């Protein structure tokens, strides 16, 4: 059976800590979408690990880690991540169906961002998915055969010829790209496998599989705050499509949310706090992007968005992250509805333009940092947790009270 860990905000919810906390109980940890635009940070024994492509199970020697077919892979960046770990043989597997991000994709991404101003990381994620959908991409499996790779490269060079000047690819682009693969393909080949068959077999044997999403539900290409979204499907449904596991294989869907809200880049954010309180949340929560180091926009918990995300994913339980960031705040707000042009909205709309937050205010608490038992939380903190559970209709099974793995309340 498989369990899914999915972010139910705009990403950066703390999925890495949760996966790291529970990965020891699983045989496989699988990253099922996105690219190295996503990042998750794990603090283990006081050491901070920033991962962008590697599944969070790499810190457990007995855990097998898979990068599945809907992930787009920068082989250069993945090789750099691999080099930071020892003995990944038979512990890391990359789907032969996963698509390869080319340097051209990053150039195209930067070119388009100048006019679109979406707030992308300009790492080539979107253009790589574009080529995938156009059926013209290079897949990881193509790196296993030099003849096939050369055929794919020739087709690529022909296709991008009209755009070389616009994307500033340079006169030596063809030579440089061949050299790029000559450098990195041999390093990555030992990890490329048919992971779809591997996971189907593991599921049939009853092995435990943890499916780890990147980014968050509200960035989903179809169901998120379009056009300010990522280029992949970020919901739990994508876990099946990417891995080859059928929906019957899914057992638990664990939705991850912070005790407040954050967003990176452009796009609507109804509960954003542009006052010094937003700065306080950013500073206390160390809200700076793992990948880009950009400061995250911060605000109050948005229950309209949270209920929507829980429904989309079929969440069976929640993990509430960074409760301690709210320590010492006298009045804590929660967005319980939107108001737009005099109309109250309690359902999440396809367009958040002109949506203003309707808040309910709660009394704060002094300290929750490092707490590991529910009864040790102050009454106001427990009331806040109970309110979220009641409104969303999903039980909170885990509460994080610091970045450390051990500072976790299990319910």
PLM features per residue range, with description:
Residues 1-411:
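Non-transmembrane, aqueous-exposed alpha-helical and coiled segments at domain scale
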């Amino acid at each position: 059976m498989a369990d899914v860990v999915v972010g139910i905000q705009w990403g950066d919810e703390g999925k890495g800590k949760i996966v790291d906390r529970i990965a020891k109980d699983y045989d496989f940890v699988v990253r099922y979408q996105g690219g190295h635009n996503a990042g998750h940070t794990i603090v283990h024994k006081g050491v901070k690990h920033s991962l962008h492509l590697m599944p969070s199970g790499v810190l457990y020697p007995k855990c097998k880690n898979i990068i599945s077919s809907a992930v787009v892979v920068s082989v250069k960046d993945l090789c750099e991540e691999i080099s930071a770990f020892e003995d990944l043989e038979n512990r890391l597997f990359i789907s032969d169906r996963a698509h390869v991000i080319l340097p051209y994709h990053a150039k195209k991404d930067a070119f388009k961002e100048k006019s679109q101003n979406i707030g992308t990381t300009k790492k080539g994620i979107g253009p790589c998915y574009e080529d995938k959908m156009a059926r013209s991409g290079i897949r990881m499996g193509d790196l296993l055969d030099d003849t096939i790779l050369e055929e794919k490269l020739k087709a690529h060079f022909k296709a991008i010829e009209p755009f070389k000047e616009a994307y500033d690819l340079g006169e030596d682009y063809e030579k440089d790209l061949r050299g790029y693969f000559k450098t990195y393909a041999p390093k990555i080949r030992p990890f490329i496998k048919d992971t779809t068959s591997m996971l189907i077999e593991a599921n049939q044997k009853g092995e435990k599989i943890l499916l780890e999403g990147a980014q968050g539900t509200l960035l989903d290409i179809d169901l998120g705050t379009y056009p300010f979204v990522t280029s992949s499907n970020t919901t739990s449904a994508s876990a099946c499509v990417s891995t080859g596991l059928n929906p019957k294989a899914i057992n638990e869907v664990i939705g991850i949310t912070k005790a407040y809200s954050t967003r990176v880049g452009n796009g609507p954010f109804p509960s954003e706090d542009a006052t010094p309180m937003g700065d306080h949340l950013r500073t206390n929560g160390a809200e700076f992007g793992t990948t880009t180091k950009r400061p995250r926009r911060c605000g109050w918990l948005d229950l309209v968005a949270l209920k929507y995300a829980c429904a989309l994913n079929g969440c069976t339980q929640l993990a509430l992250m960074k409760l301690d960031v709210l320590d010492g705040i006298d009045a804590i707000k929660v967005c319980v509805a939107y108001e737009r042009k005099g109309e109250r909205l309690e359902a999440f709309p396809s367009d958040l333009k002109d949506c203003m937050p309707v808040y309910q205010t709660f009394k704060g608490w002094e300290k929750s940092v490092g707490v590991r038992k529910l009864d040790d939380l102050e009454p106001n903190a427990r009331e806040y947790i109970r309110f979220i559970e009641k409104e969303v209709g999903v039980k909170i099974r885990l509460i994080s009270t610091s970045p450390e793995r051990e500072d976790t309340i299990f319910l």
